[in-house]
Amino acid sequence: MNKILSAGLVAVALVATGSAGAATTTTTFPVTATVATNCLVSASALAFGTYTQGNGNVNQTSTVSVNCSLGTTFNVGLNAGATPAATVTTRKMVNGANQLAYSLFSDTGRTTNWGNTVGTDTVARTGNGFGVGNVVALTVYGQVPDSAANQVLPAGNYTDTVTVTVTF
């Protein structure tokens, strides 16, 4: 019985010693992150199809899709294209030395020219954030006018490349 009692006292002493010797301390540390202001842009092709001289203007659309950080104000501009001597009011598709005029607008009536000068002829919007369903889709309204200059061009395929710039 003494052996059992002695063993029990030793066990209690060890537990008591373990409890008395266990101490803790705590601290905190800050956790931070900065969400960067950011925008991503993509655009679909603008294909006018076939322009038949003397049959009226040809109208088509394209879409510029922009994702920007939530609450970020941005401007979307379209440059004059890659053809020398083109302007944002009269862009030019080329086929060799021949140039087919066209224009890009920001409204369905095709009266508001879409250019590349912030505060003058760009389109301003506010970002919805990133993720599914948050894209800001902007329609580009294109027109090949049935103008006198366009009516004297040879048949063929005419092309240009327009650069989209998002300023934020």
Which sequence ranges carry the predicted segments?
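Contiguous segments within soluble domain cores/interaction surfaces
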Residues: 98-101, 111
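Polar, enzyme-active/binding microenvironments
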Residues: 12
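Bacterial N-terminal signal peptides that target proteins for export
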Residues: 1-8
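Predominantly extracellular/luminal cell-surface or secreted proteins
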Residues: 77-81, 103-107, 115
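Extracellular beta-sheet repeat scaffolds used for adhesion and glycan interaction
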Residues: 109-135
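N-terminal small/polar-rich segments of proteins
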Residues: 22-97, 125-168
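N-terminal signal peptide c-region/cleavage motif recognized by signal peptidases
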Residues: 17-19
